[in-house]
């Protein structure tokens, strides 16, 4: 017995020691253990992260990286994660070049050109909201300049991620949240979460990175100087190179006096200049190229990036715990969110600086540079509203209905046709005191009042009136711009209308400025070219199309007009058209970040999906009610689930079960009442029997006493 106790004690101590050691090992990150063991730094430039391909910025980590094997680069200089492999440059790859960028349209990023060239999405707007691009475009347009670039690039590694790498826990958790909404048919909430996913993880995933360093000089010189020197374009690039080498203290021999003279002319026509250092030693005036290059190995940064769209990595192989059909639906939802992000930030217009229709804010050309404007008449707007719930407490349609001032009703004047832009639902939450009568056994009743949260809902339908034929002059409204709660009127640079104009409500918070005063309001009027949205085109684009009511209209502006964003209403983009060249001043618009869809105020009662069948593979997935995890179902489980879903003759319906429960309750109450009654009656009978017994005993005692007295009288002592 003592030997058994001793063995048990030794086993317990050993188990405690092993447990304590394992805890200590997991307290420190894996890469810290590798650093302590190998005495090497960790490679700082890694793929596997998210990437916003509009802004050229890194976002959240998508692929999981671990350091359990303490792997290193092939040259043994850096520690790399288990999922990463590197391709070192066997020779020093130092590249120096000089180029001229005549137009911002041909812009190429210095550090993310490869991923910007990825063609699966709207590649024309890739990188157009990066700080680098917006600076170049603004300086070229405002200063009427062209750009020269001289750069030295030192490539050290190409770093790639294993295609079989797993998704990070945070990214997978976000995908699971979206899939849960999809499986319960909560489409709006799933769309909202997918747009949040794009906000947090970007549009792409980086799969390859070039690690190294670069030193870049960027000059802006007057366009006239380049035009006067067409025969000497090489001299312009040479002058840019000479200027750069002077800055980095590179000694060179001046061979030609003409070159020196041309360089001075180059410097006199320079309007802006800057030098950027990516990696290597921080740049300072007078730094030598040799000193900068020697510091590259200790200061690596990403010099170029390549990758694939975010939704490409949402597949059944990476999400084995979800049914295949649900994963495909999840991928499509995320893809739609990414494409919506691109579409909202696409600004079509004229990109030719020499055209009178040039649109400074446009980032894609729509062919409007050569278009001639046609005068269109504006027939006004109106909005219909129907409230579905909550109308006894909250009147939603009072703030949503809008009559057309030309007719005094929700209609278009003669000669104009209504164009329905959008139909949407407006929701508002409110608290309401609700009282109900609650009874116990249908006898004991009381009134209970609760302050409950309810959602009032109303449907609104927005229309604008387009001329359907020839209309008389001055028959419509003057258009004076528009604004919303999140945007200003470009005509007034404020959330207001010009003098003499009134506001017309459209959608939930859009204000359209209009006027009937052709004498005083004409000087503020803007040539108007129609509305269009994600659900409706613009009938003014083609007169033949507008006359054919059966043909859908194109979602664009007529020739000579440029489109501008009116608002994004619950994920739907609404645009309006004004004369090209207007509303194009100021600064470039900032990126419009998601989410664009409004989440529901109160989720409806969700259907708890427990079974998903893939008809292509004849397999079915079952959701475990305890763990809420999906798994492939066994035949017995499938039959049981099908009985639950479809029902059979063995079970009871909800009404039958409720009736049976009520019947059993009443029967039990009756049994209890009878038992109480029987017990009371039994006690009463026992009491009466006891009294009778007492009385009979008393009577017997009296008779016996009389007999004894008589006997004593007959026999005196």
UniProtKB/Swiss-Prot annotation:
Regulation (activators, inhibitors): Forms arc- and ring-shaped pre-pores on top of the membrane at neutral to slightly acidic pH conditions and converts to pores upon acidification. Undergoes transition from the pre-pore to the pore in a processive clockwise hand-over-hand process. In the pore state, 2 alpha-helical regions refold into transmembrane hairpins (TMH1 and TMH2) in each protomer that form in the ensemble complex giant beta-barrel transmembrane pores.
Keyword Ribosomal protein: no
GO cellular component: cytoplasmic vesicle; phagocytic vesicle; phagocytic vesicle membrane; phagolysosome membrane
Subunit structure: Homooligomer; predominantly forms a homooligomeric arc-shaped pore complex instead of complete rings of 16 subunits.
InterPro entries, alphabetized: MACPF (IPR020864), MPEG1 (IPR039707)
Membrane spanning stretches: 113-120, 127-132, 235-244, 248-256, 656-676
Gene Ontology MF: a single term: wide pore channel activity
Disulphide bridges: 34-70, 350-369, 385-397, 435-449, 439-445, 534-572, 557-577
Record's bilayer topology term: Multi-pass membrane protein
Single Gene Ontology BP annotation: defense response to Gram-positive bacterium
PANTHER family membership: MACROPHAGE-EXPRESSED GENE 1 PROTEIN
Annotated signal sequence range: 1-17
Provenance organism: Bos taurus (Bovine)
Official protein name in the record: Macrophage-expressed gene 1 protein
Coiled-coil zones: none
Similarity comment: Belongs to the MPEG1 family.
Record's comment describing the protein's domains: The MACPF domain includes the central machinery of pore formation: acidification causes a significant structural rearrangement, leading to oligomerization and deployment of the transmembrane beta-strands (named TMH1 and TMH2) that enter the membrane as amphipathic beta-hairpins. The P2 region contains beta-hairpins to interact with target membranes.
Stretches assigned to the MACPF domain: 30-345
């Amino acid at each position: 017995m003592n030997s058994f106790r001793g063995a048990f004690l030794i086993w317990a101590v050993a188990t405690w020691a092993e447990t304590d050691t394992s805890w200590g090992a997991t307290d420190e990150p894996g890469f810290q253990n590798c650093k302590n063991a190998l005495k090497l730094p960790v490679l700082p430039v890694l793929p596997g992260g998210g990437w916003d391909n509009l802004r050229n910025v890194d976002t959240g980590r998508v692929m999981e990286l671990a350091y359990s094997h303490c792997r290193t680069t092939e040259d043994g200089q850096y520690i790399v994660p288990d999922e990463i492999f590197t391709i070192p440059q066997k020779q020093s790859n130092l590249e120096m070049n000089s180029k001229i960028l005549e137009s911002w349209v041909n812009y190429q990023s210095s550090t993310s050109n490869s991923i910007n060239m990825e063609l699966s999405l709207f590649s024309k707007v890739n990188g157009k909201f990066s700080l680098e691009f917006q600076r170049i475009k603004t300086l070229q347009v405002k200063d009427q300049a062209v750009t020269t670039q001289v750069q030295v690039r030192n490539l050290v590694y190409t770093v790639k991620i294993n295609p079989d790498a797993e998704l990070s826990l945070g990214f997978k958790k976000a995908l699971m949240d979206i899939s849960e909404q999809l499986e319960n048919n909560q489409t709006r909430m799933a769309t909202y979460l997918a747009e949040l996913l794009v906000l947090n993880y970007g549009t792409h995933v980086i799969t390859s990175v070039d690690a190294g360093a670069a030193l870049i000089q960027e000059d802006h010189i007057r366009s006239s100087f380049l035009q006067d020197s067409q025969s000497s374009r090489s001299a312009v690039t040479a002058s840019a190179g000479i200027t750069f080498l002077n800055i980095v203290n590179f000694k060179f021999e001046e061979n030609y006096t003409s070159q020196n003279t041309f360089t001075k002319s180059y410097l006199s026509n320079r309007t802006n200049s800057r030098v950027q250092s990516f990696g290597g030693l921080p740049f300072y005036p007078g730094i030598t190229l040799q000193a900068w290059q020697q510091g590259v190995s200790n200061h690596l940064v990403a010099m170029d990036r390549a990758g694939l769209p975010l939704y490409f990595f949402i597949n059944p192989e990476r999400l084995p715990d979800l049914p295949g059909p649900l994963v495909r639906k999840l991928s499509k939802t995320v893809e739609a969110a990414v494409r919506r992000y691109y579409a909202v930030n696409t600004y079509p217009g004229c990109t030719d600086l020499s055209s009178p229709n040039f649109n400074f804010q446009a980032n894609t050309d729509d062919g409007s540079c050569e278009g001639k404007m046609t005068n269109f008449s504006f027939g006004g707007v109106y909005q219909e509203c129907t409230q579905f719930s909550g109308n006894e407490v909250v009147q939603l349609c009072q703030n949503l209905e809008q009559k057309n001032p030309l007719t005094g009703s929700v209609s278009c004047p003669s000669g104009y046709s209504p164009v329905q832009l959008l139909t949407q639902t407006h929701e508002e939450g409110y608290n309401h005191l609700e009282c109900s009568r609650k009874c116990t056994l249908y006898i004991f009743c009381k009134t209970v009042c609760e302050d409950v949260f309810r959602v009032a809902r109303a449907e609104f339908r927005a229309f604008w009136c387009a001329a359907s034929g020839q209309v008389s002059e001055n028959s419509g409204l003057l258009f004076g711009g528009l604004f919303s709660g999140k945007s200003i009127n470009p005509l007034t640079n404020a959330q207001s209308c010009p003098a003499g104009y009134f506001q017309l409500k459209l959608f939930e918070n859009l204000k359209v400025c209009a006027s009937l005063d052709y004498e005083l309001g004409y000087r503020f009027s803007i040539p108007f070219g129609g509305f269009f949205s994600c659900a409706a085109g613009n009938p003014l684009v083609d007169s033949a199309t507008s006359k054919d009511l059966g043909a859908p209209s194109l979602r664009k502006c007529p020739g000579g007009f440029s489109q501008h964003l009116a608002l994004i209403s619950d994920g739907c983009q609404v645009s309006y058209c004004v004369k090209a060249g207007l509303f194009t001043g100021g600064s470039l618009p900032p990126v419009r970040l998601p989410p664009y869809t409004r989440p529901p105020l109160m989720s409806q009662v969700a259907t708890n999906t427990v079974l998903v069948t893939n008809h292509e593979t004849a397999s079915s997935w079952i959701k475990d009610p305890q763990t809420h995890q999906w798994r492939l179902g066994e035949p017995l489980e499938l039959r049981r689930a099908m009985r639950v879903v479809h029902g059979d003759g063995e079970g009871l319906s909800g009404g039958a079960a409720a009736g049976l429960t009520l019947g059993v309750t009443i029967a039990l109450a009756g049994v209890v009442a009878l038992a109480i009654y029987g017990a009371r009656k039994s006690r009463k009978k026992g009491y009466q029997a006891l009294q009778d017994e007492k009385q009979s005993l008393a009577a017997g005692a009296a008779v016996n006493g009389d007999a004894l007295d008589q006997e004593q009288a007959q026999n005196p002592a």
